[in-house]
Amino acid sequence: MIYVIYVQSGREHDVVAALRDKNINAYAPAHDLLERKGGVWRMVRRMIFPTYVFVNSEGITDELYYTVKNTVGVLRFLGRPPTPLPMSEEVRLRWILDVENLTVSRGYINSGKVTITEGLLKGREHCIVKYSRRRKRCTLYCEINGVAAELEKI
């Protein structure tokens, strides 16, 4: 089961490292992306779900709850009491959560239809809500714990 933790912005990697030091299976998926700064395109690494960390666990015991809750940077678990992602959402997000190194997606547009040839979004064209050719970015639609969200900068 996957539990979602809300953390301080910019502290995702610190929280993941601290939880892994305590033998807790935690991760915060990031991906490579092209950004233009000063007229030059650069490859940068960005969080897919900023301020969220995911924890794999068979259940939440009191010991696990307080170990995670007392970690520096953790604000709270999503859900009261902490509830795992429903299986339907877990299955939909598994393609992002299972991959360690998410690379830049590349593709083309033909007659207004986006086709991805390589990278994170290959085979996921149906999730794309909009595409910016100038910024070289796609926006995806997904749900996390019943809350609809659009993932930008992918």
Residue ranges and their predicted role:
Residues 1-113, 128-154:
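Acidic-enriched and Gly/Ser
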Residues 117-125:
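Short coil-to-beta-strand transition motifs
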